[in-house]
Design a protein with these regions (language model features):
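Compositionally biased P/S/T/G-rich terminal and signal peptide-adjacent segments
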Residues: 50-62, 69-74
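Oligomerization/assembly interface segments of phage tail-like spikes and tubes
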Residues: 64-89, 136-150, 238
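Short, acidic/charged, Gly/Pro-enriched secondary-structure junctions
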Residues: 8-12, 83-125
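Solvent-exposed loop and beta-edge segments used for protein-protein assembly and interaction
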Residues: 74-78, 102-104, 134-138, 171-173, ...
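Short amphipathic beta-strand/extended segments with alternating polar/hydrophobic composition
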Residues: 23-39, 119-126, 195-202, 226, ...
């Protein structure tokens, strides 16, 4: 006589534990805090280059105008959508999620467990709630408008340099690092072929190569800096050295890709 295995009923909480592996974090909070999980990775198109084309009668091909610094390319923002769900979905939960996602002002850090080595800077455009399913699993679609860069988590770590050093950018896009220059008097910082003269240093000077600003403990100190431009770290290797009263340099390289 055959033996039939008893049919087992899987509770919603068991299902939740089984699928509660993928989530996102935004503005310092995790979707796990709301028992909200992702059904799949974010869906998006590659960022479009900011290029204008002009047709000229009688001439083959368009004239292209890059809306960027000479020799560089600018990329436009990209929309990313996630399908998400939580069990025993209640209006209160949906309201809490919307408050979390839609209340922050300005760009916020967005990261998900499908791509844990990278993050984006994003603003939530919408969090649409769907009807609760027969299994009591409420679904949402989360839409974010993101800057084009996928920032490397590893590229946000501080690297301390105590002497002549070489940094290697693993990506095809030039990075705009943050330097923290320590010293007891003025000196010159060399980043590749770029030279930055710092006329005076009191403990340290912070150089933000994205915003083109210099800071110390008292605030802005751009007047103490002399340079043709703030340096970037192109793809491949860049040598960093210094002279004068500079004693050490810390750098956050801020690597990124698309």
């Amino acid at each position: 006589m055959g033996y039939n295995t008893p049919k087992q009923t899987v509770s919603q909480f068991q299902l939740k534990d089984r699928y509660a592996r993928q989530y996102l974090s935004f503005a310092g909070k995790s979707s796990k805090d709301f028992l909200l999980y992702l059904s799949g990775p974010g869906v998006y198109d590659s960022p479009a280059a900011d290029v204008e084309s002009t047709s000229v009668p009688g001439r083959n091909g368009d004239i292209l105008t890059e809306n960027a610094k000479v020799g560089r390319r600018r990329y436009q923002n990209v929309d990313i959508k996630y399908k998400a769900f939580f069990f025993n979905g209640l209006p209160a939960k949906t309201a809490a999620v919307k408050a979390w996602l839609l209340s922050p002002v300005g760009y916020q850090k967005l990261q998900d467990t499908y791509d844990p080595d990278f993050f984006r800077m994003a603003v939530c455009k919408d969090a649409l709630a769907f009807d609760v399913t027969a299994q009591k699993a409420a679904e949402m679609e989360l839409a974010f408008n993101c800057k084009p860069q996928r920032w490397s988590v590893d590229g946000q770590r501080t690297i301390r340099l105590d002497g002549r050093s070489t940094l290697k950018n693993p990506f095809a896009f030039p990075a705009q690092p943050i330097f923290k220059v320590y010293g007891d008097s003025g000196g010159e910082l060399y980043v590749g072929e770029e030279k930055i003269t710092i006329h005076s240093i009191k403990d340290y000077v912070l150089l933000n190569c994205e915003t083109h600003n210099a800071y110390n403990a008292s605030g802005f100190c751009n007047e103490t800096i002399l340079s043709d431009d703030f340096p970037e770290l192109p793809e491949g290797k860049t040598q960093i050295t210094w002279t004068g009263g500079i004693t050490a340099v810390e750098v956050i390289p801020r690597w990124w890709t698309l």
